[in-house]
């Protein structure tokens, strides 16, 4: 009986000790990704979440798909989300024109955009004039690519000479069904459209050829939020690095393709996308993905757009363009490298 009493007392003590031991809550973050459904670039967030990488760094991340990367950037600026994957050219314009307190903390350098047509005989500036072109949203990422192409190659004005049709990330579906002939696409849209329509998709222009060396996407956050939760953001950057490393291992192709399910790419389409994007280092391979030359090319392009449109688009000529140092926070990456798990 005495032995039983001792055991019970010990059990009670252990239970009391466990109750008294503090449990450290995971840091909650909401991160926005462009497109409904999400574009394939956002796959990296689902990889980090669903393989437990975020959890490994004590992060509880909610991924929020938004109509466009532009809308996602505005959500960061308003404080309604903690970070977003947003088009670099939109962000540098936003910071330059409005003084938005945004910092790029990670990035994707290589754009995959193409201007495409379902008709081989309609693949020129003359053919696109007056035709509706599928984009994500007004002044969204696809809209910006079209505007750049029209201004640089066609000497035309978007909306005035070429109207746009906002469709979030459903441009490909609209082209496959015959609703529109022209659209701004990601390369992973092409095989899906061709299978659905039974027709070939024709490339009118590659944005990488129109504006060589321009930066594609930035993971952005408000400077004040970074200051307030810096340790959490360091761990977030570390998680992005680990997820990118996982994606770049060819042995993980099938696994990554399955994790891309939220993008609505499945089976062979998802495997095609993973391989194609890995080849072009769509997600950075061992780097931060915020190369100075590409980011400053994005700034220069938006300065040019601003001059050509007299401030109606791009960076307003009356504003001072953002510098590389103002646009980026590289210190999070440096600290993240010290704590890679």
Can you name each region flagged by the protein language model?
Residues 1-9:
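Bacterial N-terminal signal peptides that target proteins for export
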Residues 9-19:
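Bacterial N-terminal signal peptides
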Residues 19-25:
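Sec/Tat signal peptide C-region and signal peptidase I cleavage site
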Residues 25-177, 181-187, 203-207, 212-213:
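Short, glycine-/small- and polar/acidic-enriched structural segments
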Residues 46, 92, 147, 191-194, ...:
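Predominant activation on well-ordered alpha-helical scaffold segments within soluble catalytic domains
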Residues 170-264:
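Pocket-lining segment of extracytoplasmic ligand-binding domains
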Residues 227-312:
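Secondary-structure end/capping motifs
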Residues 299-341:
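Conserved C-terminal helix/tail region of periplasmic/extracytoplasmic solute-binding proteins
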């Amino acid at each position: 009986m005495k032995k039983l009493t001792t055991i019970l007392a010990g059990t009670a003590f252990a239970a009391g000790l466990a109750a008294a031991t503090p449990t450290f809550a995971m840091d909650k973050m909401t991160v926005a990704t462009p497109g409904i459904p999400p574009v394939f670039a956002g796959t990296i967030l689902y990889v980090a979440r669903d393989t437990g990488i975020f959890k490994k760094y004590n992060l509880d991340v909610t991924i929020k798909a938004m109509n466009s990367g532009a809308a996602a950037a505005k959500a960061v600026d308003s404080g309604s989300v903690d970070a977003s994957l947003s088009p670099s050219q939109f962000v540098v314009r936003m910071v330059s024109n409005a003084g938005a307190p945004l910092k790029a903390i990670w990035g994707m350098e290589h754009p995959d955009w193409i201007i495409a047509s379902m008709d081989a005989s309609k693949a020129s500036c003359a053919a696109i004039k007056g035709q509706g072109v599928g984009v994500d949203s007004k002044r969204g990422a696809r809209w910006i690519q079209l505007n750049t192409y029209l201004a640089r190659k066609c000497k035309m004005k978007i909306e005035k000479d070429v109207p746009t049709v906002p469709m979030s990330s459903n441009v490909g579906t609209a082209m496959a069904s015959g609703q529109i002939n022209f659209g701004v696409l990601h390369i992973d849209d092409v095989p899906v459209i061709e299978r659905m329509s039974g027709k070939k998709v024709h490339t009118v222009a590659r944005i990488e050829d129109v504006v060589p060396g321009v930066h594609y996407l930035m993971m952005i956050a408000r400077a004040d939020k970074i200051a307030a939760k810096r340790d959490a953001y360091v761990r977030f950057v570390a998680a992005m690095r680990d997820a990118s490393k996982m994606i770049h291992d060819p042995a993980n192709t099938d696994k990554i393709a399955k994790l891309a399910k939220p993008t609505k790419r499945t089976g062979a389409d998802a495997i095609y996308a993973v391989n194609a994007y890995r080849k072009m280092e769509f997600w950075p391979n061992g780097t931060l993905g915020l190369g100075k030359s590409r980011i400053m090319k994005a700034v220069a392009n938006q300065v040019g757009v601003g001059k050509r449109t007299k401030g109606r688009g791009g960076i307003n000529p009356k504003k001072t363009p953002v510098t590389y140092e103002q646009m980026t926070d590289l210190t999070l990456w440096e600290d993240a490298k010290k704590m890679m798990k």
